Amino acid sequence: MHSHLRSILAIACVCCAAVLTAPQMVAQSAPLPTPSPSAVARARADSLRYPYTVADVQFMSGMIGHHSQAIVMSKWAPTHAADPAVLRLAERIINAQEDEIGTMQRWLGDRLQPVPEAKPMSHDMAGMSGMAGMDHAPMMMPGMLTDAQMKALNAAHGADFDRLFLTGMIQHHKGATSMVSTLFGTTGAGQDETIFKFASDVNVDQTTEIARMQRMLFEFELKRAVAPD
């Protein structure tokens, strides 16, 4: 009995010693796989399989010029004695619309369509001859300010700049939302995943900003009305 117990204890000691002297293994997480160039290419090809139309290309190309004018208007705010609230709004517009221009330019380039520069000018459809069915006449995008309106805004300072900026940007944003409505009202257009999300975001964001600017304009006009002469 005692010899049997001693045998069991001896075996247990040997096992413990083996565990204590064994090399310590540290669990390591497997490194994340790096996508191969071919996998990236396949993913990009998959993203291009969504159908797109002439109306989609026109929308993205036209919105680049449309956004560009809003950026020019917003960049005048710091140099034209704008109200702090207008300065904050202008900064948000610049940041958001510069990013969106990049998205639109990449979308067009990925589909081998002409990529307009970010210039606030009348949208010249003649620069979009790469896709059949384009109307080649120069045209003004909805809501864009005329040369006379832009000159008046650039000449204004202080409260006059605030008023012209807000009224002009409300007009500008309403034009952008009308472009979205036209896109979604065109048969077959707006089905591409990127365009659908982008256009939907433009509609929501700019509709929200229109309401904000209308409140700001009302508050500025009220403040001016009660201010002593």
Q: Whereabouts are the PLM-identified features?
A:
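Bacterial N-terminal signal peptides that target proteins for export
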Residues: 2-12
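Bacterial N-terminal signal peptides
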Residues: 10-21
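All-alpha RGS (Regulator of G-protein Signaling) helical domain and cognate RGS-like helical scaffolds
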Residues: 25-229
